[in-house]
């Protein structure tokens, strides 16, 4: 039931208030991120700007969204902080986004925005509104360093782990028969199975997998495949009717690119041109926000009925 689903989601939410800052995430080599430009901020829907923002991110993905104690790091964290400052929000509360429950966090009011390596798809756009995209990547493979697996065509007969509710899982089921699929709620669960040699590969977006390859406990334990085999565009998700907020987030993302903050955040969190494809290092073109949906109530407050 809906009540049970909400209870399950609440159990994995750990909100911690943090002040939006002008620096990138607390990671080695992080650099200063400039504040949003004040000249463009005046064009926002300031009367609607909340004093705080609840943002759902992953808690277990190095370089993308990672929680260590009360410290948060990753590209999604940096983008969330930049957006918050741009729209005039003074405080962010981060909550955990488990892949299968991202839409539920928005629907139940436990999050205002979701930045969690969340690929924009037509089906998802029926349920939520996406601003962005803010990153372009593709599905890849994470394997042990000595593995001979390089491409998805080599996967039949092997066991592959992916995250429940992800586009990566859909891709394997629809287009790559003959492999054995293990599905877990969190990507870190899959990576643990790979390190323990219980699966032969992990699949997810390449930008996410590169973080696990860099953070593996010993040098040359894990590596990513050299090619990607889908196109994924990460968006900032919000409730379906939050069209004004969508416009504001798009303005913030455009400003982040213009100031150079986007490029610095991507390179400091995800790597350099030697480890990432060109498209991931290039700001993607922002898509237009959807038009506001017509009201379902009449001028007298009643709900129209069909004849």
Describe each region flagged by the PLM.
Residues 104, 117-126, 174, 200-230:
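A ligand-binding cleft/hinge motif common to bilobed small-molecule-binding domains
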Residues 170-184, 220-223, 253-305:
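Ligand-binding clefts/hinges and TM-proximal coupling segments of bilobed small-molecule sensing domains
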Residues 19-117:
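Extracytoplasmic small-molecule ligand-binding "clamshell" domains
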Residues 92-104, 147, 167, 182-196, ...:
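Short helix-initiation/N-cap motifs at beta->coil->alpha
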Residues 13, 77-87, 158, 166, ...:
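Extended ligand-binding regions for polar small-molecule ligands
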Residues 8-11:
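C-terminal motif of bacterial Sec signal peptides marking the signal peptidase cleavage site
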Residues 81, 92-154:
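Acidic, polar ligand-binding/catalytic clefts
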